[in-house]
């Protein structure tokens, strides 16, 4: 790894090391909020390569060895928490299994492979002269957009000018990403006896609201993210069959585009719904990076596809410019028998190296 450009044999050796780490992580349960053991594995790996590590709860942060005050800062980030395993796996989700050119295991694709590739590219970039400083962050609680993930690391990281977020994008560069608003909606009525048709049925009010949510289209359509998306995903009403319900509660999953703030979207919904509309949070915003940013231009030069992402990542909690890219396929995420193709590890390493080595990063954060 000491030459400017690695031979394929050298890259294969790096890929084997990354694979070994990925297998350790798969074998370690790391549900969101329970990432202590996986954080320890990543911490020890960094220390074995000579890096000082800062643990911020279950987040693992490391700085490059050749830090230059005042230089722009590149953050390499991916998450090491996973969703919970479902019961319909054909193999043990915590046992890394190689078969048919694949590595199976929970978190192998989302986001174990991007994580280990970014970590070993962090090592690789540290051995080469760059015009930027390097940060590496293995974050916790990404799958639940938790407050004990990226948000509690921002102060420790300081100024960041560009983040590369590792998620399974088939090594396409996601230049925009939808945000998320989860709404708890309650419609109110008056209880009464169902046989006598008494009361005001809150469930019927909810049906009217759901019909509006299903048919309404926000006027502003993003060139890159398209329309705002809304889906009702949960509903609950009533206590027994012969009582008209006096309240109905339902949940709405809203995926904003970059034409509206989250608060603007909530206000529009409130204007049209006869009920209480309460967002669980407003901070998971859409994100995007300018088409003329050097990382976007370099991706174009390399023939890397630039896409918009419908799924959300830790980008939503980052106040600085970011892109999302990594080995693996988003359609494999959160599925039984999750896997990564072994060749994707090698492709991820080489793809990251081509994109990031020698990149000129403009300042964004104030110094």
Residue locations for each model-derived region?
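A structural signal for short hydrophobic beta-strand segments in well-ordered beta-sheet cores
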Residues: 53, 96-98, 232-235
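N-terminal helical capping/dimerization or prosegment-like subdomains
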Residues: 2-85, 247-251, 265-271, 342-353
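Short glycine/proline-enriched coil/turn segments at helix->beta-strand junctions
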Residues: 47-51, 57-58, 70-71, 127-131, ...
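Predominant activation on well-ordered alpha-helical scaffold segments within soluble catalytic domains
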Residues: 23, 43, 116-123, 151-154, ...
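Metal-dependent amide/peptide-bond hydrolase catalytic core
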Residues: 2, 13, 84, 175, ...
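Hydrophobic/aromatic beta-strand patches that form the interior of the parallel beta-sheet core
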Residues: 74-76, 137, 164, 323-325
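Acidic/histidine-rich catalytic neighborhood of metal-dependent amide-processing enzymes
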Residues: 115-182, 186, 222
């Amino acid at each position: 790894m000491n030459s400017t450009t690695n031979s394929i044999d050298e890259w294969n050796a790096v890929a084997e090391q990354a694979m070994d780490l990925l297998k350790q992580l798969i074998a370690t349960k790391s549900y969101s909020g329970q990432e202590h053991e996986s954080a320890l594995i990543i911490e020890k790996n960094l220390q074995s390569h000579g890096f000082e590590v800062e643990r911020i709860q279950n987040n693992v942060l490391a700085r490059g060895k050749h830090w230059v005050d005042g230089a722009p800062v590149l953050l390499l980030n991916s998450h090491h928490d996973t969703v919970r395993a479902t019961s319909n796996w054909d193999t043990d989700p915590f046992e890394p299994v190689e078969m048919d050119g694949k590595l199976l295991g929970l978190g192998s694709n989302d986001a174990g492979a991007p994580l280990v590739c970014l970590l070993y590219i962090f090592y690789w970039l540290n051995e080469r002269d760059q015009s930027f400083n390097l940060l590496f962050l293995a974050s916790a609680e990404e799958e639940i957009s938790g407050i004990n993930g990226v948000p509690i690391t921002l102060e420790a990281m300081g100024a960041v000018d560009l983040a590369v977020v590792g998620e399974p994008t088939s090594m396409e560069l996601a230049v925009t990403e939808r945000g998320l608003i989860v709404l708890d909606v309650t419609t109110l009525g008056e209880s009464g006896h169902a046989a006598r048709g008494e009361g005001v049925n809150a469930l019927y009010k909810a049906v009217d609201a759901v019909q509006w949510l299903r048919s309404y289209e926000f006027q502003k359509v993003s060139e890159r993210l398209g329309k705002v998306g809304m889906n009702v995903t949960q509903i609950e009403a009533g206590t027994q069959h012969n009582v008209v319900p006096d309240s109905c509660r339902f949940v709405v999953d809203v995926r904003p585009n970059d034409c509206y703030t989250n608060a603007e979207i909530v206000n529009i919904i409130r204007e049209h719904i006869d009920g209480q509309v309460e967002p669980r949070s407003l901070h998971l915003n859409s994100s995007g990076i300018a088409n003329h940013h050097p990382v976007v231009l370099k991706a174009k030069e390399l023939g890397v596809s630039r896409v918009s992402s419908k799924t959300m990542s830790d980008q939503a909690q980052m106040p600085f410019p970011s892109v999302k890219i990594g080995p693996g396929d988003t359609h494999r995420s959160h599925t039984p028998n999750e896997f990564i193709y072994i060749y994707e590890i090698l492709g991820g390493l080489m793809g990251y190296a081509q994109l990031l080595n020698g990149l000129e990063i403009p300042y964004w954060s104030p110094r």
